[in-house]
């Protein structure tokens, strides 16, 4: 008898040996030992309190910036969805959003409430939880500019509130990445503005994204962080990797490729494995370093075991 046969009772769903590929935008990767879809915050807390503390736990959102390796993920993967997707305007140009709220939805709700400053979220294909953890940003703005506080839950099911200062935001990073905490919701603050003007700016961002990024492909968004003084897409492009296919097995062609539309977007053309995608990323990193002396660091989160 293993821990998987002795899981705590829940009101949500427990899926044993569940494939993770459908939970990510890349559509690759092996299974999780267990996927837990909590009904709400209390369901999540009760589960964590009762779960064997030796079992690893990882929370995910919509999997838009996530690469799951082909061997799958040990322990419990918590997928936050219903029960964590409410948005509430608080007054004083503040708005609260659950961790499972898509960033673009938060931007739209803020616009409707006349709160400016969150427009850039219209260009980020993730959720509030992920944006908080990685300090997501684009077009000159980032989460650190607008976040006031976040409520988080630890491995024991205990909840506490952290201020923006306590999150220690830096470029595409926060203290949450190393703390094993699950974001429940966050409060943001913007500036008062006319809803129509805000929506017009959001429309510009959405249009720009649609014409410059492969948003209809199986992708994980920006693959590499921008090194100081450089643009990752330009380094990848100048190294000759735009549109070039790759297979980890060494076969000609392959299903992994850096997008012809935007060379910092790694895409699965339909037949790639996680090993192909990660292998291409690491090959490009090594090639760029050899040619330019510039180190590219992954922005996409890679989890799990190789096959």
From Swiss-Prot:
It is an enzyme of class 1 (oxidoreductase). It is found in: Cytoplasm. Keywords: Cell cycle, Cell division, Cell shape, Cell wall biogenesis/degradation, Cytoplasm, FAD, Flavoprotein, NADP, Oxidoreductase, Peptidoglycan synthesis. Its main location: cytoplasm. SUPFAM superfamilies: FAD-binding/transporter-associated domain-like, Uridine diphospho-N-Acetylenolpyruvylglucosamine reductase, MurB, C-terminal domain. Its cofactor is FAD. The active site is at 172, 222 (proton donor), 299. One of its GO terms (molecular function) is FAD binding. Belongs to the MurB family. PANTHER family: UDP-N-ACETYLENOLPYRUVOYLGLUCOSAMINE REDUCTASE. This is UDP-N-acetylenolpyruvoylglucosamine reductase. The gene is murB.
């Amino acid at each position: 008898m293993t821990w998987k046969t002795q899981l705590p009772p829940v009101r949500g769903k427990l899926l044993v040996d569940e494939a993770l590929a459908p939970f990510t935008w890349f559509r690759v990767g092996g299974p999780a030992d267990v996927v837990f879809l909590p009904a709400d915050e209390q369901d999540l807390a009760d589960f964590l309190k009762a779960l064997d503390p030796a079992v690893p736990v990882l929370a995910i959102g919509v999997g838009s910036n996530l690469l799951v390796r082909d061997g799958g993920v040990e322990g419990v993967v918590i997928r936050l969805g219903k029960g964590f997707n409410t948005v509430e305007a608080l007054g004083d140009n503040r708005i609260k959003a659950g961790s499972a709220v898509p960033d673009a939805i938060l931007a739209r709700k803020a616009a409707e409430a006349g709160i400016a400053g969150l427009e850039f979220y219209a260009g980020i294909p993730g959720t509030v939880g992920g944006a908080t953890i990685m300090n997501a940003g684009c077009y000159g703005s980032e989460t650190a500019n607008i976040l006031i506080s976040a409520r988080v839950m630890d491995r024991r099911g205990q909840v506490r509130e952290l201020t923006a200062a306590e999150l220690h935001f830096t470029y595409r990073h926060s203290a949450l990445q190393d703390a094993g905490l699950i974001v429940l919701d966050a409060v943001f603050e913007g500036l008062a503005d006319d809803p129509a003007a805000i929506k017009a700016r959001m429309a510009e961002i959405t249009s720009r994204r649609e014409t410059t990024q492969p948003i209809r492909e199986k992708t994980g968004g920006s693959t590499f962080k921008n090194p100081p003084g450089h643009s990752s897409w330009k380094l990848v492009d100048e190294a000759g990797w735009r549109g070039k296919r790759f297979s980890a097995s060494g076969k000609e062609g392959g299903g992994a490729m850096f997008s012809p539309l935007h060379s910092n977007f790694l895409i699965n053309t339909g037949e790639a494995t996680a090993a192909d995608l990660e292998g291409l990323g690491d090959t490009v990193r090594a090639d760029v370093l050899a040619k330019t002396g510039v180190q590219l660091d992954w922005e996409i989160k890679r989890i799990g075991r190789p096959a």
